[in-house]
Amino acid sequence: MSKEIREMIDKVKSFNQFVNENVSNITYKKSVDEDRTTITAFINNKKVGSLSMGVLFDAYQYEFDDVFDEDTFDEIYPDSEIVKIEHIEVDDNYKNSGIGSELMKRGMELMKKNGYNQFYLNASPMGFKGLGTMDLVEFYKKFGFKELLNQGHNVLMGVVF
């Protein structure tokens, strides 16, 4: 093995160790305003990711009336209150480190503890560098989400616990 290849391998190992050490030292903070809950991940006081969600009290009227008829909507979501996961982001340097999964897990657990068991989101690559719609769909399926409607550029997904 050449010296250059060995040096590259050592650099990759060093970087992986750095990322793993930093990822284990993540601090999560929750903030709540009148209509949105945000969970933010920090490493050494630097924001590395966040998840924003809000409760929709008349979701059919505001989100679904042009997508499903009301009977179909009521079959999918029997209760009127639905948590919409509005936005999730992870710093490019920390993608694939588990931060996004941890944000989803913490956010959903928090909302379930507060009595909400229905969730909805748009799987759309807008703002996700290097990820396609189907990559996001597969990510959200890990949390129980199912495809409700594939619109090509965007997939509506939901889960009821």
Show which residues each predicted segment covers.
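Short acidic, low-complexity intrinsically disordered linear motifs used
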Residues: 4-22
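Active-site rim helix/loop that mediates acceptor-substrate recognition in acyltransferases
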Residues: 21-43, 50-52
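Conserved acyl-donor/pantetheine-binding loop and adjacent beta-alpha core of acyl/acetyltransferases
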Residues: 40-87
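Residue-level recognition of the GNAT/N-acetyltransferase active site
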Residues: 86, 91, 124
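Conserved acetyl-CoA-binding loop-helix of GNAT-fold acetyltransferases
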Residues: 90, 96-109
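Conserved GNAT acetyl-CoA-binding A-motif
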Residues: 111-131
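C-terminal "cap" of GNAT-fold acetyltransferases
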Residues: 124-126, 130-137, 141-161
